[in-house]
Amino acid sequence: MKISVRNLEPTKVKLTVTVDPEEFNPYLDEARKEIAKQVNVPGFRKGHVPGKIIDQRIGFGAVAGEAVNNGVPELYSKALETKKIHPMAQPEIDVQDVPESAKDETKLKFVATVERRPDIELPALDGMEIEVAKAEVTDEDINNRLEALRQRFGTLVSVDRPAAKGDYANIDLNAEINGETVDSQEGVSYELGSATMLDGLDEALEGLSAGEETSFEGTLEAGKHEGEKALIKVKVNSVKAEELPELDDDFASEASEFDTLDELKEDLKKVAAQDAESRQATAARDAFIAKLEDGLEIPVPKGVKAEMVEQQLKNVTADPSKATKEQKAEAEETVEKELRDQMVLDVLAETMDVKVSQGEVFNFLASIAQQYGMDPNAFIQAIIRNGQIGSAVQEVGRSKGLLSGMRAVTFKSEGETLDLSAFLGEAAEDEESESVEAASAAAAVADSLAADKDAE
């Protein structure tokens, strides 16, 4: 098999693959066997029709077509592996030359254009030191947690005064465009200052008492008229303020397992310290990835980026074409960072020679299923049927590569070496652990079995 590679862009290549007859012939033979299972030829048992008879009765063109459909994907994968190209998307394949008869010496030739991972050279991890902010717990942290707990036990009481920030107003809303009502809601409970509904609503409500009305111009954020300007009329039905319990021993015994307020505060301090250490570990992770990418120019595949940006916009607006410039810019920035991080972590996993077992992949998928309240077995089978096991293998590989890489460097805070072993764990030496390639191969078999089952 002859493979020529032409770099169209830093993240896009064109492969021209020419396959010798002796390498393509096994695919032709396999195609004849498959066709023989499906046709009835007088004088022969089904599935036992000689290849030459298949060529004569069915036609060599049909045989070659079947062989191309089955062979080109495999040959394409071999070409990628040979040239060490890591695809980021599905290829565009153009089959240019196919033999027209069993005696035709024409070589199979196809061209594959695909977006690829760019070449990335990571810095050496040996001797790398990364500074991370100290994990601190302040009195403010403890007081904030205490206040949050206090608010959980608060009650709403009606007040006879104008609404202020932090109050809860029961309101009726009516949106008009050109004098016509396009949306309305009644009896909505809204916390002033939360900014969780229409822009301008907080300002309009502040200072209004129960029974009073006002109007303002705002932009509708959902529905058929999303993004359009409308006259928003709002009526205040009632105003309630939050009444919080006193911070004393009685509150501590009611809100927790502790008898005194001092005991409760001490426990909150411990929880705050644990959270601070967790945030520090997250900061260490982010700083490590940033260190790997520092000084590197990492181009992202344009097509992959465009698809991910569109998907990102679908999460914030029903119609991506109506997204604002700010939304588009934010989506592009988010996607570019996500892609760069993914590519760097893939290279890191390869550099650290990460091993991924099938058990780890299935545990990873089971944890996702649990998060969404789904049956793990059903979720895993759906992933297999959709051919997405490869992506799961990749995600597990990235996570393990990240942990392995972080264990190889030194993290410091104010000159002192940090011990992040509680978050990074210990490097496992599992001789039975399978490689990423082996897990991927097993996944391919699972996908094939699922496809065969569906075909039945």
UniProtKB/Swiss-Prot annotation:
Coiled-coil ranges from the UniProt annotation: none
Top enzyme category: isomerase
Origin superkingdom: Bacteria
EC numbers: 5.2.1.8
One Pfam family cited in the UniProt record for this chain: Trigger_N
Domain notes: Consists of 3 domains; the N-terminus binds the ribosome, the middle domain has PPIase activity, while the C-terminus has intrinsic chaperone activity on its own.
The name this protein goes by in its record: Trigger factor
Provenance organism: Bifidobacterium adolescentis (strain ATCC 15703 / DSM 20083 / NCTC 11814 / E194a)
